[in-house]
Amino acid sequence: PPRSTLFPYTTLFRSLGFPVVGDWVVVERQGAAGAIAIHQVLPRQSQFVRQAAGTLTAGQVIAANVDTVFLMSGLDGDFNLRRIERYLVTAWDSGASPVLILNQADQFADLPAAIAQVETVAIAEPIHVISATQGDGLDQLTPYLSPGKTVVLIGSSGVGKSTLTNYLLGEQQAATQAVRLDDSRGRHTTTHRQLWPLPGGALLIDTPGLRELQLWSANTGLAETFGDIQALAADCKFRDCQHQGEPGCAVQAAIAVGELTASRLQSYQKLQREQQWIEQRQDTQARLNTKRRWKQMSKTIRQHQKRKR
């Protein structure tokens, strides 16, 4: 049957109600060896959601019921502080705890400099430097992989998610490919999301590389990721300070003395605007969805009344 008939929708955005990797579901087998039908998706403890690619206002759940999000970045051309900030916002919004993993340590000469840069954007999150191909530093990840815990790997193509998956599994299960040397871009070796049981009892979700990550939720992600800016803003002279030249702006004062970079403030303001924009789109879409449901309900009632006459 069509998937929309297998279980009831529980959200205003139907795409968020479909089962995804990591979901716990109520199922029924049709006969001794028949197909298994999903009747209900149980409430999620966490969900990593992005705005789906394209023009429609729709959330795409990447993984559900995750305890820890491993945000992987390569120490090559993939390394981008603004992308890391975006990943952190979405990870915090998911309800899980983000952990930054810097891969390809064996190919980078100045690791202390790279770590220092990341620490300017990852204020409170753990940072681990590893080499998935060499197996270096991977013992740092053991505390996150205790029995019953679920971890999802998030990152661009070619950052080493599948290589790390194979190492943690202890065998070659996920396909891997080399990164193009000319632009450090990876090839999509993982084409679908897959949940792997690890030998120690944890669950690992490997995901395809993300080419884009637009915000969807408006929870605590911005506050968690940019806590340094929000703390400075509390000392601004005006409560509605926009940090754009107003007198007594503590944020601009911090930039002037080198405590904060202008690029980090710009990133914060850009993500704020994006979040406000998607909230407006969601509100509009929610009203349209509600209108459609009432219209369909009215039509059903009229048809029922006609049949009774």
Per-segment meaning from a language model:
Residues 82-92:
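Histidine-anchored nucleotide/phosphate-binding helix
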Residues 1-12:
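Short, small-residue-biased leader/transition segments that mark boundaries at the very start
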